[in-house]
Each structure stands twice: as C-alpha cells, then as structure tokens.
A protein has these predicted regions:
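Conserved SAM/SAH-binding beta-strand->alpha-helix loop
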Residues: 91
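Conserved class I S-adenosyl-L-methionine
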Residues: 60-67
C-alpha cells in the first residue's frame, strides 16, 4: 500500500470512529502550545484499538488521560472497555470542546473532564491507569509523576502508566 493510500485509510478510520462515538476530535491545534505544553493532537484510533484490545482495561478500571484535549482517549476507552475515564486539560478552548463532545458522546456518562494544570491535579484514589500521549514537557511530567506517587502512597494499589511519545 502506498503512503498516500495509507494516510487516506487512516483518515477514514479517524472520521468513522468519531462518527460512531458521536464526537469531534480530528485535527491538530497549535494555537496555545509552547515549550512546556504541546499542541493538541489526538491519539490515533489505531493506537487506542491496540490498547483496548489488549484486554488489560475493563469496567473495573479508571483511566486518567493527561492532556485529554477534546477527550478522544476517554470516549473511546469508555466505549470499548466500559471503564470510567477522567480527562485533564489546561486549555480553556480545547476543554470546552471536550465538554461539548461529552453532551453527545455515546460513552459520555462514563467520562468526566477537569480543567486543571496537570502538575497541580491530585490523582483520585480510584485511578489505576494513567495515559500520556505527548502532552507536555519533562518539567511538567516530573510534577505529574510526583502527584501520581503521592496518590499511590496514600492509597496503595497497582497502577499502570502508558506513554505514547511521538
């Protein structure tokens, strides 16, 4: 398959999943990115399909998506695995997109979104999966990991961190 054909197939997959989930998450947005917070760029559905099909996430789990953007990870995983999901986003405009999506999304009832600075956000005790898709710099990541460790020590449990770095 040629590169152009692969891109067209991938774009169709992105659009089809958004339509099925009743959300709008495609595209990239660099308008509020800087050296610490990276552009809005949703995780490709092919990556989420592999994660969901791993069988490691189920309805007993709660996923925390750092830099959730418009909520694609939360909506997809909640739909496919029946898990609960929490999305953290600092950008007001993009956060508004996640909230609009939640109103229409088929899995909206199992998702929630918080507008917050990821480095300051206290990790809820029920969270056992943390997902990162290239959301921010190492400086912010260090603060986030400190919060995750705090939560783990306060409420010991198995926790899984998933990093997708581009």
């Amino acid at each position: 398959m040629q590169a152009e054909e692969r891109k067209t197939t991938m774009d169709q997959n992105e659009t089809q999943w958004d339509k099925l989930l009743k959300i709008r998450t495609t595209g990239r947005d660099d308008s509020h990115s800087d050296q610490y917070r990276y552009p809005y760029e949703p995780t490709p559905y092919c990556v989420l399909e592999r994660l969901a099909n791993s069988g490691m996430i189920g309805k007993q789990n709660t996923v925390l998506d750092y830099g959730t953007g418009k909520g694609r990870v939360c909506f997809y995983l909640s739909y496919q695995t029946r898990c609960r999901s929490v999305g953290i986003e600092y950008d007001e405009r993009i956060f508004s997109g996640a909230m609009e999506n939640r109103e229409m999304a088929v899995s909206g009832a199992r998702t929630c979104f918080v507008k917050a600075d990821a480095g300051e956000y206290p990790v809820p005790k029920e969270v056992d999966w943390c997902y990162f898709f290239n959301p921010f710099s190492i400086e912010i990541l260090q603060k986030v990991l400190a919060r995750i460790y705090e939560s783990f020590y306060e409420h010991p449990r198995e926790k899984i961190l998933v990093f997708e770095i581009i």
